[in-house]
């Protein structure tokens, strides 16, 4: 037979502790239920608000929607107009930049062409200046410079003398007459070598010789009857060898003036260099106002002692390549 087991009787302290524990558990459960209820209520409220908003949107009329569309279209048109204005401004700026660039390029082209034409004109003028004065054109070497042409084209006012380092004697004739000694059998011509000037060496080259305008060519001359004619073939012997001193310029100028007065030539008839081909009888080489060069025999053509002054000797030194001068 089963035995009956009796539980032990709880004490008062144990009973109070058990009661307190049960009450705390109940309170905790109640709080949890309250929190869950609050969350549910909040969700319900949010859902209700969404529903109300949706209902309000659905209740909006068609006119209100049209008004909103018109406002948005106006705003779009304003933005498009601003875009068009900005595009036009950009196009205008680009067009002005293109015009300015073309203008600068045109100015640069004009300046370049003007500079080219000026240089071409200067080059052509220099070439014509080098060719002028010789009928042969390109056959004559262009060694005649502008300074020599200026000296030959002007009168005795531009007669210049060069001071040379040499002997102290002055190579010049008397102011009245040149010193010539007649010699029928002499060989005084263009092929005669120049006389010797002593042991001193000349300090100048043939290109630096004294060139003064004279009315006489270096070979044959237009002779006029003189009281005491001399033959062309004569030895030219200076009384004293040497070079021009600075003081001999006055006597040289007097001799030139005296020679021009004796032969009938004026100072205005300054001579310019002429190419040797001008003596050939080719047509068109000599113009009508030019002086003809008469080739006369040595026995008949003569001139006075004043017809050729002393300073003509530098022209005789060009024996290999004589230069003729004409009006």
UniProtKB/Swiss-Prot annotation:
Effect of residue 327 to A: Decreases methylation
Modifications after synthesis and translation: Sumoylation regulates its subcellular location. Sumoylation at Lys-45 and Lys-71 regulates the shuttling between the cytoplasm and the nucleus. Sumoylation at Lys-71 is required for interaction with TBL1X. Sumoylated at Lys-45 and Lys-71 in mitochondrion. Desumoylation by SENP1 leads to relocation from the mitochondria to the nucleus.
InterPro entries for the chain: GPS2
A GO-annotated cellular component: mitochondrion
Cross-link (Glycyl lysine isopeptide (Lys-Gly) (interchain with G-Cter in SUMO1)): 45, 71
Subcellular location: Nucleus; Mitochondrion; Cytoplasm, Cytosol
Residues annotated with Omega-N-methylarginine modification: 323
Example of a GO biological process term: negative regulation of toll-like receptor signaling pathway
Impact when changing residue 325 to A: Abolishes methylation
Species annotation: Homo sapiens
Tissues where the protein occurs: Widely expressed.
Region Disordered, residue ranges: 26-65, 177-208, 253-327
Pfam families xref list: G_path_suppress
Primary subcellular site in the record, as a coarse category: nucleus
Protein name: G protein pathway suppressor 2
Gene responsible for this protein: GPS2
Coiled-coil annotated spans: 14-109
Subunit structure: Component of the N-Cor repressor complex, at least composed of NCOR1, NCOR2, HDAC3, TBL1X, TBL1R, CORO2A and GPS2. Interacts (when sumoylated at Lys-71) with TBL1X; leading to protect GPS2 from degradation by the proteasome. Interacts with UBE2N; leading to inhibit UBE2N/Ubc13 activity. Interacts with TRAF1. Interacts with TRAF2. Interacts with TRAF6. Interacts with PPARG (when in the liganded conformation). Interacts with (sumoylated) NR1H2; interaction with sumoylated NR1H2 and NR5A2 onto hepatic acute phase protein promoters prevents N-Cor corepressor complex dissociation. (Microbial infection) Interacts (via coiled coil domain) with hepatitis C virus (HCV) NS5A.
Positions of the UniProt region annotated as interaction with SUMO: 61-94
Record-level Gene Ontology MF annotations: cyclin binding; GTPase inhibitor activity; transcription coactivator activity; transcription coregulator activity; transcription corepressor activity
Induction: Down-regulated in liposarcoma. Down-regulated in macrophages of patients with adipose tissue inflammation and type-2 diabetes.
Its biological purpose: Key regulator of inflammation, lipid metabolism and mitochondrion homeostasis that acts by inhibiting the activity of the ubiquitin-conjugating enzyme UBE2N/Ubc13, thereby inhibiting 'Lys-63'-linked ubiquitination. In the nucleus, can both acts as a corepressor and coactivator of transcription, depending on the context. Acts as a transcription coactivator in adipocytes by promoting the recruitment of PPARG to promoters: acts by inhibiting the activity of the ubiquitin-conjugating enzyme UBE2N/Ubc13, leading to stabilization of KDM4A and subsequent histone H3 'Lys-9' (H3K9) demethylation.
């Amino acid at each position: 037979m089963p035995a009956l087991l009796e539980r032990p009787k709880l004490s008062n302290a144990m009973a109070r502790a058990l009661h307190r524990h049960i009450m705390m558990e109940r309170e905790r459960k109640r709080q949890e239920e309250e929190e869950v209820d609050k969350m549910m209520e909040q969700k319900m409220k949010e859902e209700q608000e969404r529903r109300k908003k949706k209902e309000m949107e659905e209740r909006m009329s068609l006119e209100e929607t049209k008004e909103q569309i018109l406002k948005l279209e106006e705003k779009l048109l304003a933005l498009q107009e601003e875009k068009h204005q900005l595009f036009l401004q950009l196009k205008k700026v680009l067009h002005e930049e293109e015009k300015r660039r073309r203008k600068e390029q045109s100015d640069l082209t004009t300046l370049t062409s003007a500079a080219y034409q000026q240089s071409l004109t200067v080059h052509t003028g220099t070439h014509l200046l080098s060719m002028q004065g010789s009928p042969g054109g390109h056959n004559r070497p262009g060694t005649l410079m502008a300074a020599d042409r200026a000296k030959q084209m002007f009168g005795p006012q531009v007669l210049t003398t060069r001071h040379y380092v040499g002997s102290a004697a002055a190579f010049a004739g008397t102011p009245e007459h040149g010193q010539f000694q007649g010699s029928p059998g002499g060989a005084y011509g263009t092929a005669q070598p120049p006389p010797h000037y002593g042991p001193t060496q000349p300090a100048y080259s043939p290109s630096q010789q004294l060139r003064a305008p004279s009315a006489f060519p270096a070979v044959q001359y237009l002779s006029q009857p003189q009281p005491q004619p001399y033959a062309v073939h004569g030895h030219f012997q200076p009384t004293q060898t040497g070079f021009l001193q600075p003081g001999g310029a006055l006597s040289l100028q007097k001799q030139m003036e005296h020679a021009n007065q004796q032969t009938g030539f004026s100072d205005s008839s300054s001579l310019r260099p002429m190419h040797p081909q001008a003596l050939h009888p080719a047509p068109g080489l000599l113009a009508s106002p030019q002086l003809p060069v008469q080739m006369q025999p040595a026995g008949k053509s003569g001139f006075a002692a004043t017809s050729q002054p002393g300073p003509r000797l530098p022209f005789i030194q060009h024996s290999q390549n004589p230069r003729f001068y004409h009006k």
